[in-house]
Amino acid sequence: MSESSTGAGLGPGIVVIDKPSGMTSHDVVARCRRIFCTRRVGHAGTLDPMATGVLVLGVDRATKILGLLAGASKEYVATIRLGQTTSTEDAEGELLQCVSARHVTDEAIATAIGRLRGDIKQVPSAVSAIKVDGRRAYRLVREGHVVELQARPVRIDRFEVLAVRPGPEVGLADVIDLDVEVECSSGTYIRALARDLGDAFGVGGHLTSLRRTRVGRFELDQAWSLEDLAELPRLSRTLDETCLLMFPRRDLTVSEVEATSNGRPISSAGIDGIYAASDADGRVIALLRDEGPRTKSVVVLHPVFVRVSIGRGIVGVIEA
C-alpha cells in the first residue's frame, strides 16, 4: 500500500507504536503523518534514538490530549553497565572513564537501588531536551558547553534487578551489567538512574539498552510496528475510547452538552480530578474538572458546529 493514500477516514485517535532503535521520536511522527495523510500527528513523550518500545501518538484532534498522556507513569526495562562513564550516559556517547566494578557486591547493589526508590530529587541528564535559557540542553552539550541542571522531584515506584552479569566483551571483565525494571513518574530519566547508581560506587555507570514497556494505560502488547501501520493504517483507540479509558465518565444532559461544547461552565459533578463529559451516544464532548460549584474546561474535544451561508443558497458547516 502507498503511504500517501491509505490513511484517510480513520478519524481522531491514539496509535501505540513500538519504536525501533535508531529513529528519533520526530522521525516516527513524520512517518505516521505520511501513513495517516495528515500533519496533525504528535507524540506523548520522547524516546531517545537508542531506545525502543512504547511511543504513544495522537492523530487529528487527539493531539489535544497528548499533554495529559505525557504526564502518565511509565515502565521500562533497561541494562545498566557499572564501571564505565560516557558523555551521554548511554551507549551512544563517548567513553570517558573505565573503573573496575569487580568489588561491587549484589548486596551493595540492592542497598544502593533501595536509596533510589520512592520520592527522590533527580538531576536530569545533561543530554536532555530540557531548555536552558531557551535552548535545548543536549544542543549546548554538543557545542561543548558545560550544562548544570537543577534537581527535580520524581517518583520511582519500582526499581528491581532482574539479572546481574559480568561484562560480556573482551577487555570488559571488570564491568557489571544489570538488567533492571523501572516503574516511575513522568519526567524521570533512566539514564540518570544509571549515572547515579554508578556514582554511588565511585565506578560510573551508563545505559546500554532501554525499552519502554508502558505509558499510562498503554502497554507494549498493544503496540504496532511502523511496517504494520504502513500495510494497514489503523488506530489503537478512538479519541472517545481513549478518554473513557483514561478518565472517569460524566453523562451530560442535552442542555449540558450544548453548554460544554461552547466552553461554558456547568454545575460541578463532585468528581476528583479530570473527567470525561460525554453525550448520550458516548461521544466525549470535553474533558472537565470541578472548580467549586462550577466546571472548568480542560479541553473541548467536540466544539459546537454552526451552519453558515456561503452564497447562492449553499449552506456550509464550520467549527465555531
From Swiss-Prot:
Responsible for synthesis of pseudouridine from uracil-55 in the psi GC loop of transfer RNAs. The keyword NADP does not apply. Belongs to the pseudouridine synthase TruB family. Type 1 subfamily. The active site is at 48 (nucleophile). It comes from Mycobacterium leprae (strain TN). Keywords: Isomerase, tRNA processing. GO terms for biological process: mRNA pseudouridine synthesis; tRNA pseudouridine synthesis. The keyword Cytoplasm does not apply. This is tRNA pseudouridine synthase B. It catalyses: uridine(55) in tRNA = pseudouridine(55) in tRNA. Its EC number is 5.4.99.25. GO terms for molecular function: RNA binding; tRNA pseudouridine(55) synthase activity. CDD domains: PseudoU_synth_EcTruB (cd02573).
